[in-house]
């Protein structure tokens, strides 16, 4: 008997009587024992779908297949006839990084502490980016190439993540999950003329007056806004060309029938009152997918179908795992909408806005198929806070210019208000641009109540860490290892509920003053913070709290609480000591404490003049801070320009 045959028999513990088999029988046995396991592996690999994500940035569903005939999107329009188009898909934030954090983890950014734009959070040990589960199951996972997750992803998240990452580098017959991101339609592709020209090179550009027919009513209709809107359509066409190239590559490789393709955008239009906001202009996105016939379950993925099923992009990760035959981990807050063993369809989707670059504004949103509810936790902040990035764009500049002339259209004037409503409710079927707030309409009182309750239940269930000041989150991360631990760890107690109630109380007015004063003695800084904010909101009606506010401002261990107390005293007409405290925090505080102090000084306008020199001295970059502390520099630059009548520009 040949030696290799003996070795095979020994390795597989075959009985010695095998030696008496005929050569033909032996060959059959050889195939059964040796080859079939390998063939089974290959068959299992072939049975699992490849999954291709083609994502883009900063676009709402302004595509031909979504009913915009002036959009030039032939590849996506054709793709929609081959797959399923979702009319009610939404993001969890109106800006890229917090949304991408939710997508890659299947968890809300407000649970993880990745909610502030441009932060550096840490994940708790048990939470992993979902591609790691695919890799463990044998998938080849690539990302080309944007990450922007708000945390440093583990090294084994991807097999490859770079501008060269591609599914074609996988092993033979290995299933793949590949992501390609088109960045050309980012807001910078509209605002930056050179980028716009590069992205749209070789394309026939849209007629500006024609596409202006879809210009939203909250923009002034001027040549410059029409130009921005036309550029927006142009970069969408460039993206459509890119999309078609990726589908063609899949066809050329003979993989179209083996690959589920999902197209989505990371948030809405990259223009004011859309990007960064929780209106549909910022939250509603295109979502189209194509499922080869052999991978369809029931009615899932039938070609040419439009569905109004509510989808949140937090569901993409769990869905991708589910269609790959992997049970999503229990900690994920997203839910699968394709594959086997699906949960009940969503009744609500949720969104959050927190710090956008250099400006804080805590806003939450709840959406059903018809209604949108918005809770403004800081309604005394002006609607259009000054932020460097959007202010560089022509549309924002036109809004400012036309507002100064007093000729803004009524819809645009709504968003020049120095304050916001505490709550907003919109019937998106009758009012798709969300201009008519129904909160005070008696016919919608029950709907308002239901949506408000859904919001508070979500805040509680998901443990919304966005209600904690960022400087306090930073301290908690250092103490516990991750922001998640602050409200989910063993020491949290009922902090989650106390925080929710204190934040809600801050908007309750003078009648809630005794309860707000009580929160000033809470043992957690975040609760004290909201008590001071609430008292400041009612200005001189909270005068009986002045002694407690003075004590907090001078003695509290938390700079966030001291800043909130100083703000309250300034709003009550007692700025002297308050300005000194804000100046001291500006000099010596941590980066996020300094930013909050700078914002309060900016919001006090000319009241801040006594600390003008301190503001000038602190308009400097500091190493060791996120982006060298540029956000504080931006706020101080804006404040100084207003106080001095200057026009200095900072990056």
PLM regions: where:
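N-terminal secretory signal peptides that target proteins for export/translocation
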Residues: 1-25
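Long, internal low-complexity/basic segments
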Residues: 3, 7, 12, 45-49, ...
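Short, basic, low-complexity termini and linkers enriched in Ser/Thr/Gly/Pro
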Residues: 8, 38-39
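Formylglycine-dependent sulfatase
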Residues: 26, 41-417, 432-453
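Bacterial N-terminal signal peptides
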Residues: 26-38
